[in-house]
Amino acid sequence: MGSAQARQRLLAIFGQVQAYIFQVEMLKRCDPSALLPLVGSLKLNALTIRMLRRKLGGALIEQAQHQQTPLACALTMALEYAEVEGERVLRAVDDVNLAGPEGFFRATMRLDEPCEYHVRVHLDTYGGPIDAEVQFLHDAENFLKQLNYCHLITGFEAGLDALESVARFLTRTVGSGIVVPPELCDPTHPCSVCFEELCVTANQGEAVHRRLLECTCDHITRQMAVRVANIDIARHLPHALSVASERRAAAEAALRALEARRVQGHNGKSAGTEDPTQQVASRLLESHHVFKPASRCLYAVSELKFWLASTKHGDMGQPRAIDTFTENLETLDKQEKFFHLQAATVELALFGRTLDHFDRLFADQLLGLDVIDGMLVGSCAVSPDDHIEALIKACYTHHMSAPLLQRLTDPDTSNREALKQLLGRIGVDTDDGAGELGDALDVDLDNLGGAPPVNSTPCGEDALCRTVSEERPWDKLLERATADASQRRRMYAERLSKRSIASLGRCVREQRRELEKTLRVNVYGEVLLHTYVSSYNGFCARRGFCAAVSRAGTIIDNRSSTSAFDSHQFMKAALLRHPIDQSLMPSITHKFFELINGPVFDNAGHNFAQPPNTALYYSVENVGLLPHLKEELARFMITAAKGDWSISEFQRFYCFEGVTGVTATQRLAWKYIGELILAAAVFSSVFHCGEVRLLRADRTYPDSSGAQRCVSGIYITYEASCPLVAVLSAAPHGAIGAETVVIYDSDVFSLLYAVLQQLAPGSGAN
């Protein structure tokens, strides 16, 4: 079977296991009496999961000993979770007669047990032990990134032991299906993919870390838009073939009756909520017909009604954002109550009783939650997007309640006020509609107040008043100043209101992303699993390398050989008397970055490869390395090449005795690796034996048979017990065989001397 076919089969099995896990999670929340007829099928599925684990478990474990893949890892976790939780449901069903429905829910959902998402992680480094607690998804990702940064001061056994604890956490989370519990995810914590995306997008002069503060992560978990409609029950009811057709018909009839009552009540309420001023104006206009003369007053009322109607039903322009949102939280609460009424009605029609599901049995506890917790828990009747839109609607409503903003956002306000004043002038009471409409129609607008009569001028002599006005135009200065001030006040209010609305809209757009990520249904992404697999494969490759080189045909172990001291002294004296070629510093620096970088960020091995400094940049930035350490790391090789770069004593290369603390141990490991790189560079230029290849043990890979492929070169294993291994005369594809020569050493100079001896003419080594 080819690799593609094997992958297809694993994907098919993984999909079926995921479907089974989803069904188990649904059954945990259903009335246990509904599970009793399904016990046979549940047991058959549980036995199938056991059979799959027995049949695939051995092969999956054997593969994990050499190299893990995300698919195989996810399948292993899903099978383990499915077996444990499926049998938990079966045990709870067997005990339901004694424990009752509440005991069933407490057993299946582990309500009386401590939180299952708290996992302690212990890591032994060369600089001392590290203890951490993983309780969120971003905690697991942060620990994996920290372990990736500290890989060169961590042995493979300690690294794999720590990853085993992380795997337990991932089994309870990533292995539990596709839906993420809301208490596990905090989208305000950016992941490594968020950082990489911000590094390749336009920053507009803003620092990456400042942009990360405004980042909402959608990689560790991915949000899904879920829509819930009122007709979902009616839509799926005809497909419930397990009940009699008569009961289905009765349930459909009951749903139609409920919907008719709801629509009738909604229409009656809508008809009774019309503004009283508009009602009076409508009755006033309805009492007129074409055989009656239309006064200017009646025409003004009709004109105001026209403008009010045109702004309400007009199709000019796009609707405002405030008008596009759904009803407020009270409306959503009514929608949820109607959904539960529908569900209870259908259950009574189909089964003759209502079922004790989890949300009904624990309704009192759920009602005790506050608004925020209630929205996080969610509802089967209201989608998260409806909650989000209701929140934004409430935000807009509160902001728009200011009179200043109401005048700007609601242009009909002035029209309604004018209509109300007009009806009041003609003697119509807008509160109860009393008054004689016929007499009111004869009122002329010219006599409704405003300008005084022509003959009632206060000035006795018209000519004198006119002369004074013409000679002294400044007498209206106060009036003009008042009008100008009013106009400026109006313009300032409009500008201030528009700016306020723009700021509110910008705030809503920014916060909406976080609201959607928090309240929507989230599913597990692939970032966390890929990060775990990459870190696991790095430590696993180191273990496989150490096991592979131990099977070589010729093994020379100089780690505890006292006879190698003369070789150490000779090679050290020969290399230290020669200066380092400064033209080699760029390549030497890149080799340093390549050897200290962790296994997670392997950008140099991508199809579109990036230099080693890019991968190291992602590694140190994702762990929040302090700026002074980043500066020291960037200039490390340049500084080391200018001084005495030989720091290790005889057979004490990669020795950390007496050093405590992660930072101090890490800095010493950098010095050891820098010494190895500089010694190899000078060795190649002095003895003219070609380039000495410095390789990493965690960049070796197994073949299809599981054998580790190790090409010829000097390997750094990052193991304090055996830090340096030289592999000579390996097969063309890196296979370790009888002709392969392997040299173990814990001293750089004695190892180079041994390599020089093996490369001498007539030795047969290469």
From Swiss-Prot:
The answer, when asked if Metal-binding is one of the entry's keywords, is yes
Write out the residues that bind ATP: 683-690
Cell compartment(s), UniProt:
Host nucleus
Q: Which GO terms describe its biological process?
A: viral DNA genome packaging
Name the Pfam families for this protein.
PRTP
Where would I find the C3H1-type zinc fingers in this protein?
191-219
* Keyword Metal-binding recorded: yes
Gene Ontology molecular functions: ATP binding; zinc ion binding
Record key words, sorted: ATP-binding, Host nucleus, Late protein, Metal-binding, Nucleotide-binding, Viral genome packaging, Viral release from host cell, Zinc, Zinc-finger
Predominant localisation class: host cell
Q: Which InterPro entries match?
A: UL28/UL56
> One GO term of the cellular component aspect?
host cell nucleus
**Similarity comment:** Belongs to the herpesviridae TRM1 protein family.
Q: How does it assemble?
A: Associates with TRM2 and TRM3 to form the tripartite terminase complex. Interacts with portal protein.
Say what the protein does. Component of the molecular motor that translocates viral genomic DNA in empty capsid during DNA packaging. Forms a tripartite terminase complex together with TRM2 and TRM3 in the host cytoplasm. Once the complex reaches the host nucleus, it interacts with the capsid portal vertex. This portal forms a ring in which genomic DNA is translocated into the capsid. TRM1 carries an endonuclease activity that plays an important role for the cleavage of concatemeric viral DNA into unit length genomes.
Specify the protein name. Tripartite terminase subunit 1
What organism is recorded for this protein?
Equine herpesvirus 1 (strain Ab4p)
